[in-house]
Amino acid sequence: MVNASVTGIGSMESARRVVEALIRGGVQHVVVSPGSRNAPLVYALAEAQQAIHVVVRIDERSAGFTALGLAIGSSSPVAVLTTSGTAVGNLLPAVMEADHAGVPLLVLSADRPEELRGTGANQTTDQIDLFGSHVRFAADVAAGDLPEPAVRTGLDAALGRLDGVATGPVQLNFAFRDPLTPALDGSDFRPLKSSQPVDAAIETIIPQHQESEHRYQTVVLAGHGAGPQAELFARRHGLPLLAEPSSNARFGPNAVGPYRLLLEHFEALIERVVIFGRPTLSRPVAALMNRADLPRALYLPRPATWFEEGKRSEQIISDWAALSEFTGSGSASWLEIWLAAQIQAEAALDDALGEELSGLRLARELWGSSENLVIGSSNPIRDADLAGRPRSESPRVHANRGLAGIDGTISTATGIALATARPTRLLVGDLTFLHDVGGLLLPRGEQVPDLQIVVLNDSGGGIFTLLEHGTLGDEPAYQAAVERYFGTAHDAELASLAAAYGLEYQLVSSTEQLVEMLQAPVSGRSVLEIRTERTALRGLHDRVRAAISAALTI
């Protein structure tokens, strides 16, 4: 028998307290998916629309990744609100990415009160600890309880303010009893115009320089999330900087271009390795990081979820001065041979690419012409890593490299474009585009970002062509299997999909046309499609490798 006695505050009062606590805690954006059980929070957000930015998405999976993009773009915590049931489960992919990427994503899940759980009530399941170890903190706020303590603790956990806890996602599960709406005559409307927020930005650590007396032939590796401090460190110590695109350190006088091919020639000369962020893109870099004969140091100034103590062989250093002492300063000749080799390699790369409209040429042109760039997983991020020529100042580059999935990329880019309020370009393959094509759906009246989606369409999974599967696919016994299970060819019409969601569309058929299109400003939403053949990929990469190898005289 259900206990009819209820105590504590009502659902609308609880929801208003949640929203005010979020705003005071520095939350600037909330993504909402419609539902009934989360209605109290929806109405509370509507009352606070002058104090907080609310985005509406129909699909919860897209909502989760949109919130992820908003958090990445704003460098601040962002909440995503769903109703109960499977709606919450649809957030799991975004939560997993936020976990491994260290993004402060707050899941606000609505739930039935305790007396309705386990009774067969509609749309009711066990939502507590649904995300397991992927969240830093999870709280079940009972119906009628004051929600502020859970919100404050959740924000502290999401921002890494708790001892030993890395920045990342949290879940706040709010149980609401009927009534789930304000007074139906409108008399209960309580607008929240403003609330003094605290500073909830994610801190960037830029320590003071410490000169070292030692000299080593050290290289600085900058992986995802390294930030501009990696460039600063390499420049101050006179060292070559090998930076992945989403490190946001691939710029400045020490940055080296197609470094993964140069490593084949210079690896034996390297005496020490310093790692910022999390490099994941190439096997030559992975091999260098795992060389037991080399002293290697991983700079880790704060806890990181992708690192477990005792699981990696590098020396872990959290202090800038100690890192400087380990690294030493590079000799002028050490840096010069890398930079000279880069000049030769870049020229050889241009010659090898020619005027052919390939993924590498596309990435090279995009890197040089974009200021706010989102890059999808699989081949696009690796094309940018090989072909993106370092600039004097880095474009702002974003990528979902926490778990490096292809899901949710359009939604993530949409969130980034909204948060930064800057024209944004997204580079993706066709499968990544199709996987999140639902992310193009904006409810009528929602803010439209300035987002240009550049799709490299090779009708399937091109990355497998460059892996061992490509070699196996040449064998008659496996050719059909490799094409079916890894190639996954399709006949999707991207122009029709773009039209269905109200985006402008252009098929780009030449490098000259591509350059012209990239010179035009990004306004509203559009799709540029570039069609290539997967079968040509291995040959192109072989030509590039051979051309660079032949050009090096250092």
Swiss-Prot record:
Protein name per UniProt: 2-succinyl-5-enolpyruvyl-6-hydroxy-3-cyclohexene-1-carboxylate synthase
One Pfam entry name: TPP_enzyme_C
Keyword tRNA processing attached: no
Disulfide-bonded cysteines: none
Subunit details: Homodimer.
Similarity comment: Belongs to the TPP enzyme family. MenD subfamily.
NCBIfam families to which the protein is assigned, alphabetical: menD
Cofactor remark from the record: Binds 1 thiamine pyrophosphate per subunit.
